[in-house]
Amino acid sequence: MPSLKEIKERITSIKSTQKITSAMKMLASSKLKKAQYQMNCFLPYQRKLNAMLNSFLFCITDFKSDLTKKREIKRIALVIFSSNTSLCGTFNSNIIKLFNETISKYRYLNQKDIEVYTVGKKIEDYVRKLTFPLKVEGNYTQLIEKPNFARLKQLADKLLSDFLNQKIDKVELLYNHCKNAIFQTTNLEPYLPIQMKQPKSTSHADYIIEPDRDTVLNTLILRSLYSKIYAVLLNSVIAEHTARLVSMQIAIDNADEILEELTIQHNKQRQQTITNDLLDIISSSEALK
């Protein structure tokens, strides 16, 4: 049985750890609220933009764009979103699992024909340590801490340029999506070529487009692509902070349970020590009579 000193040391150690997890929980909560605010401000714009674009393309059936053309897949680019740090539950392991499944899906391609863009230090470290070489393109880990539309636009422009120049034939986005505080999903979404959805309303409107149809539609397509990858980044950041918030709360609850057990154990041990001391005093007193 541990001594009183050992129990006190464990209690002190757990309380110290609990302070750290509480601070991390507060920090995760603050970052989560900030990311949710960014998403809430951005989401109406993205939805309206996509609805407008889909409506135009549904009505203008003869419009053609190189960004919508499907080609035989000979070279692919994967953009994977993870976190920069740990202590966020299964957040990173889930995205790594999805990445491995995706790589297996394209095993018919040569390794040099798979480009990997990592947005997050954890997935970057994992890819660099693989036994088979996959080239990591660019450095975008800073976007996780500070989501920046302009910086992410540079990545989107690189992907667009490579796709239009037929250096790659397909682009896919891999990320975590937070449905609620308990449930998260790993998503794989096609990015290029563009896949347009049919609008809910099937009525054909007679649009007057200025300055000209192609200029407006190409601009809308580009903005839609920029907004999509930015929304994916914000989704991943929200999922990360939610996972960390839940993990820290679980750690705090576990610490409370252990502290309760140790406190009971400490009190019992202390009571036993006092009882033994009293018995020794009584025994000594009886012996002196």
Curated annotation (Swiss-Prot):
Major localization class: membrane
Keyword Transport belongs to the record: yes
Subcellular location: Cell inner membrane
GO molecular function terms attached to this record: ATP binding; proton-transporting ATP synthase activity, rotational mechanism
Keywords noted in UniProt: ATP synthesis, Cell inner membrane, Cell membrane, CF(1), Hydrogen ion transport, Ion transport, Membrane, Transport
Lipid bilayer topology: Peripheral membrane protein
Pfam families found in the cross-reference section: ATP-synt
Gene Ontology biological-process annotations: proton motive force-driven plasma membrane ATP synthesis
GO CC aspect terms: plasma membrane; proton-transporting ATP synthase complex
The family this protein is said to belong to: Belongs to the ATPase gamma chain family.
Cited function: Produces ATP from ADP in the presence of a proton gradient across the membrane. The gamma chain is believed to be important in regulating ATPase activity and the flow of protons through the CF(0) complex.
NCBIfam families to which the protein is assigned, alphabetical: ATPsyn_F1gamma, PRK13426.1
Quaternary structure note: F-type ATPases have 2 components, CF(1) - the catalytic core - and CF(0) - the membrane proton channel. CF(1) has five subunits: alpha(3), beta(3), gamma(1), delta(1), epsilon(1). CF(0) has three main subunits: a, b and c.
Name the record gives this protein: ATP synthase gamma chain
Species this chain originates from: Azobacteroides pseudotrichonymphae genomovar. CFP2
